């Protein structure tokens, strides 16, 4: 019975490759794929992520339902000339262990010793055995895997998608990417890397003068960063304490920016997204990747 349940779960996570669902979002992009919506799996994933949702105080965190709007932000960022994300794959609420292992084997950006010693165990854990498609928010979550050069997104938040894309940008501009990934085991390096990723997200939102999303980003990325800082506090619940401080600072900054933008609105706001829209019927006609 356990074997049958395990096989059934694996098949449900993987979806059916021969009958792909309609692609929901911006549409086919060579660097983006989306998993098939599976209500029982996605619903259970939401339950597993409740604690993370509470800590970050946002129900869209790890909600396994990425909207067209969030994907549009990702598409626009990836296609910017200044975004160094060539070759990076963006996987939206998807369980595809075959693709993950294939990308691990073919990712020449990271030298083979790093991929064997660090990439294999990392990928087996986060992409095969304990996939974010089900366990995001409980064990893992939105993340960038430098060994497969893949961003996995499960939250319907543009700021989170841009943050993870910022990790790709940060890693891809490094000459020694494997070493940069290895350095994360040194205390404090993770804080630097998380800061650089969030900095890239905020840069995009401020450059495009997307004030609503910038204000929302302060409320999400600051407490998220606080969990990393709090993890270094030698007390029980350090990450939670860090998140609370992040909420205070982030919401204070958001309030300050909101007042500033109301008092001094930009003369000519810059559009962050393509002005064309796609009808739901047209979207349903576009085939999906798994």
Where are these regions (language model features)?
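Bacterial N-terminal signal peptides
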Residues: 6-14
